[in-house]
Swiss-Prot record:
Substrates-to-products reaction catalysed: D-glyceraldehyde 3-phosphate = dihydroxyacetone phosphate
Binding of substrate, residues: 10, 12
Source taxonomy: Eukaryota, Fungi, Dikarya, Basidiomycota, Agaricomycotina
Taxonomic source organism: Coprinopsis cinerea (strain Okayama-7 / 130 / ATCC MYA-4618 / FGSC 9003) (Inky cap fungus)
Record has Cell cycle as a keyword: no
Protein name per its UniProtKB record: Triosephosphate isomerase
EC number per UniProt: 5.3.1.1
Catalytic residue list: 95 (electrophile), 167 (proton acceptor)
Gene3D superfamilies: Aldolase class I (3.20.20.70)
Disulfide bonds: none
Length: 251
């Protein structure tokens, strides 16, 4: 089975006006995008519905976070049921900024993943190691630990609705990027773990994408790797070069 290429744009807490957010999507709507690449953008929560309304057929929308409860006294949270009801197909979970700034554990990420799937959402599941963990040779172990909590919550058939985003924490927003071989090696390790922990079928069919200072200059080389199925892009998704990243596999 050929895994379709996937490029997501995580806007984080940007831009600071709805007009600017709409302009980003309108530019994508007009762009010549590779039709074989699945394109998803994740605007701030306030902009989800207006962006969903104007996004063309080639652009899907993702929430940046969701809670693991469907409703209740959880001030400030958004439930997966609400996201699904709004017609938003994707949600990003486990991003390193959520893990570090908001102290989300792998177990919490796993609960959120289960809740999102139960409500019909597709999940962009983020994993990745810190610079210290990489220097200690623990990259594979850290990624496996983060994945193992999710594996415990999922059935084999659930994985068809998961995209794994490997994002080394030391490369996010720093301008540093994992070398092509470093990224490919970790993606292979992720597949080896999935083959053992879930099944060879899931390991073969699950898309594993790379994130961490991806830009137009390095995207083609990264996209040429056998086990890199796309990108989760941060800052560059707010710039015109995002189109070039989407088209990284285009001849």
């Amino acid at each position: 089975m050929t895994r379709s290429f996937f490029v997501g744009g995580n806007w984080k807490l940007n831009p600071t006006s709805l007009s600017a957010a709409k302009a980003l999507v309108e530019a994508l709507n007009k762009a010549d995008l590779d039709p074989s690449t699945e394109v998803v953008v994740a605007p701030p929560a306030l902009y989800l519905l207006p962006i969903q309304e104007i996004a063309g057929k080639a652009v899907k929308v993702a929430a940046q976070n969701a809670y693991f409860k469907e409703s209740g006294a959880f001030t400030g949270e958004i439930s997966p049921k609400q996201i699904s009801d709004a017609g938003i197909p994707y949600v990003i979970l486990g991003h390193s900024e959520r893990r570090t700034l908001f102290h989300e554990t792998s177990e919490v990420v796993a609960l959120k993943t289960r809740a999102a799937l139960d409500n019909g959402l597709k999940v962009i599941l983020c994993i990745g190691e810190t610079l210290k963990e990489r220097e200690e040779g623990r990259t594979a172990a850290v990624c496996e630990e983060q994945l193992s909590a999710v594996v415990k919550q999922l059935k084999e058939e659930d994985w068809s609705n998961i995209v794994i985003a490997y994002e080394p924490v030391w490369a996010i927003g720093t301008g540093k990027v994992a070398t092509t071989s470093q990224a490919q090696e970790t993606h292979v390790d992720v597949r080896k773990y999935l083959a053992t922990a879930v099944s060879p079928k899931v390991a073969s069919e699950t898309r594993v994408i790379y994130g961490g200072s991806v830009n137009a200059a390095n995207s083609k080389d990264l996209a040429s790797q056998q086990d890199i199925d796309g990108f989760l892009v941060g800052g560059a998704s707010l710039k015109p070069e995002f189109v070039d990243i989407i088209n990284a596999r285009k001849a």
